[in-house]
Amino acid sequence: MDKFTKLTGVAAPMPLVNIDTDMIIPKQFLKTIQRSGLGKNLFDEMRYNQDGTEIADFVLNQPAYRQAQIIVAGDNFGCGSSREHAPWALLDFGIRCVIATSFADIFYNNCFKNGILPIVMPPEVVAVLMEDARKGANARMTVDLEAQTVTTSDGQSFPFQVDSFRRHCLMNGLDDIGLTLEKVAAIDGFEKAAATLRPWV
């Protein structure tokens, strides 16, 4: 998992509430267990017409936001079914941070496990960030996980809070496997001691 320390990039405004996981990655794309390749179908039914052509006014199809790395969204982002493909699709597209007033719990947890930083901000702050995101590619937002701040293109800075353990994992690029590998020496020591104490096992 890639480390997340500080990100400066284009933020895409998505002022919608209840963006669910089926909107993020529709069910017909869930047949794979590969984490790569899902980005092209991110928000598929919002990005494309039935004939496969792009819907021009969808934010991620607009030239200013095609390389967006941050999404600023409305309330209850990631609700619906608990598919882990949703953060996989966001990450594969290039999204490393989602800012919203609230998240569905399972989606929120899955983001941290897949290298995406979900940030909860109060509505008045999200409104400011949404307006800044509407400035397009010339306005670049900065998310500093170490300082726990989001800074707009004009220098306004807003604090946020992240659980210290999750912050540690993101900043060090540690998923569940990485966390286990940090304890390899302790695990080996335990197994050797257990083998000595209980050789019949």
UniProtKB/Swiss-Prot annotation:
GO biological process: L-leucine biosynthetic process
EC class (word): lyase
Listed EC numbers: 4.2.1.33
Key words of the record: Amino-acid biosynthesis, Branched-chain amino acid biosynthesis, Leucine biosynthesis, Lyase
Role this protein plays: Catalyzes the isomerization between 2-isopropylmalate and 3-isopropylmalate, via the formation of 2-isopropylmaleate.
Quaternary structure and partners: Heterodimer of LeuC and LeuD.
HAMAP family for the chain: LeuD_type1
Protein name according to UniProt: 3-isopropylmalate dehydratase small subunit
Species for this entry: Cereibacter sphaeroides (strain ATCC 17025 / ATH 2.4.3) (Rhodobacter sphaeroides)
Name of the coding gene: leuD
